[in-house]
Amino acid sequence: MCIRDRCCISPSSTILHYSVFKDYGKFDESLKACEDYDLWLRYCAFEKTHFLGEQLTIKNGGHSDQLSQLYWGMDRFRIYSLEKLLQNKNLSRSNYQLTLTELIRKLKILMGGSIKRGNIELAEELNKKIIHFQGLLEDE
């Protein structure tokens, strides 16, 4: 399952059959960013992906018009997607545990950034979530 760090699948370098969208849904339009991460989480939790061994695309990042440049705390969107994935009753136990682990990791990163920027209220809210999800992980 591809959940670590950033999305490792680029939509512009992907070939999908239209049935993928029928089976796993489309991009979540309620997300302002990371909607591709959300889709790949849903897909990779149940399907295998195949990567070509050679690099066929050139990725250029960091442009001012990229969504990652427009919004603070991009992990907020990834956290939302991970929480949403946990609600899927068909998620295997191992993928449930992987998702919980990654969710806790991202919550800690966002909490650290919140503390660094003096947003104590958000940090406290995130800490409550961390405690909650750590409890779920320990119950596994």
Residue ranges: model-predicted function:
Residues 106-113:
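Residue-level signature for tetratricopeptide repeat
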Residues 96-99, 103, 123:
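Residues that mark the junctions of alpha-helical repeat units in TPR/alpha-solenoid scaffolds
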Residues 3-81:
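Conserved nucleotide-sugar donor-binding catalytic segment
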Residues 88, 103-106:
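GHKL/Bergerat-fold ATPase module in large chromosome/replication-associated machines
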Residues 55-62, 68-93, 117-136:
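Catalytic core of nucleotide-sugar-dependent glycosyltransferases
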